[in-house]
């Protein structure tokens, strides 16, 4: 007769939730209660009924998958009353071919009771609100860049090569010329009056670039795109004001993070918005690197370790760290820039930049945890480190050949 395999129970009473946009399927089980599965809607009143049902049955722990934003309304209602364990859906997949809402909630409850679930990081409310602001600002900033690129295409369609003679067509000189093209009769000679003396290109070359064929359609498109850019930049300014208000209590952490080469003020706020200011939620620096997806995955078979891609993690913090790593790689006479140059020869640009991003994350972890500024090692650190290791290696080899061999210590 086949024996039934059960997990050892480590939690007294728990609940597994299968969360969707419109429904929540809940399964409770544990000591002194009968396993039961119920379905609730995601409206607030129904979620309150779910909360009351769980409290009535003495539930202490609740597990649910981090499915998009659908878990947030549930967390808002249950968060103050139960220990919520938010889990990655990839980590709790059931047996293929056996998937229903009821079975999923029962499987989550079973794993929860056995203590087999790894909880995802849920920042405090203030950090979650700051994260919303920073992510929205990032999206709007990209939208502005997209609109500016579209504007350049309209100019190109009108045979105006303004981007070939100005580094930034949205500078003071460029905007004066653009406004005149939109609002006045198009005349290349008159446009030259707006050219500032600091522009490197000659006036004859500039005139050649701005001589084109402008139609009413081009004027309409340019005006509409400019209005879109201005409106979006106004919204970004409002968000910046709100971010400044939200980050007042994190002033010290932001100031210290700015000491990392390539990070800057916006980068420091971005890091705080994703990881928070309490590093006790991460047992050590390896855990935060794993959570962010900034460390290699494990790929070992038959005792051999094979190369593997970086692990899955927080896509937003990963993108931010890569962006900051590019900035750090362009700094002068810094450890991070020399590290990038050292790695890029054997790894290639993409892997090298992820490695530098990993360094920035680890530095950020200790800076926030210990409230200390970044310790700049300098561009010579790596070469000196390799030199010292090489000297130590040759000393060891020589002493193996001649145990009584002594070395003189050179005094600088």
Summary of predicted features, one role per range:
Residues 1-412:
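A detector of single, family-specific signature residues
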């Amino acid at each position: 007769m086949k024996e039934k395999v059960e997990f050892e129970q480590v939690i007294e009473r728990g609940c597994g939730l299968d969360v969707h946009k419109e429904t929540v399927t809940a399964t409770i089980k544990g000591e002194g209660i009968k396993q039961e599965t119920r379905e609730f809607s995601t409206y607030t009143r129904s979620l309150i009924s779910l909360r009351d049902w769980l409290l009535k049955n003495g539930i202490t722990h609740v597990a649910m998958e981090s499915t998009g934003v659908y878990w947030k309304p549930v967390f808002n209602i249950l968060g103050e009353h139960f220990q919520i364990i938010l889990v990655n859906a990839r980590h709790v997949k059931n047996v293929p071919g056996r998937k229903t809402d009821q079975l999923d909630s029962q499987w989550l409850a079973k794993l929860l009771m056995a203590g087999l679930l790894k909880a995802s990081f849920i920042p405090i409310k203030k950090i979650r609100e700051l994260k919303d602001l920073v992510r929205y600002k990032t999206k709007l900033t990209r939208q502005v860049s997209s609109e500016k690129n579209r504007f350049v295409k309209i100019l190109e369609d009108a045979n105006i090569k303004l981007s070939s003679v100005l580094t930034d067509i949205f500078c003071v000189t460029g905007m004066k010329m653009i406004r005149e093209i939109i609002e006045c009769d198009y005349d290349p000679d008159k446009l030259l009056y707006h050219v500032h003396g600091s522009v490197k290109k000659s006036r004859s070359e500039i005139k050649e670039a701005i001589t084109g064929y402008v139609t009413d359609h081009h004027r309409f498109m340019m005006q509409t795109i400019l209005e879109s850019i201005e409106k979006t930049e106004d919204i970004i300014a409002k968000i910046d004001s709100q971010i400044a208000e939200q980050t007042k209590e994190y002033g010290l952490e932001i100031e210290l993070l700015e000491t990392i080469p390539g990070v800057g003020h916006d980068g420091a706020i971005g890091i705080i918005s994703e990881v928070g200011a309490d590093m006790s939620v991460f047992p050590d620096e390896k855990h935060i690197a794993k959570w962010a997806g900034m460390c290699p995955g494990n790929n070992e078979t038959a005792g051999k370790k094979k190369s593997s891609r970086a692990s899955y993690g927080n896509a937003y913090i990963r993108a931010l760290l890569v962006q900051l790593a590019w900035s750090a790689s362009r700094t002068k006479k810094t450890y991070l820039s020399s590290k990038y140059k050292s790695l890029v020869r054997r790894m290639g640009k993409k892997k090298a930049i992820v490695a530098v991003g990993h360094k920035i994350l680890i530095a950020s972890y200790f800076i926030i945890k210990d409230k200390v500024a970044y310790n700049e090692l300098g561009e010579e650190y790596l070469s000196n480190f390799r030199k010292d290791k090489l000297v130590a290696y040759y000393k060891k080899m020589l002493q193996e050949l001649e145990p009584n061999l002594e070395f003189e210590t050179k005094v600088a």
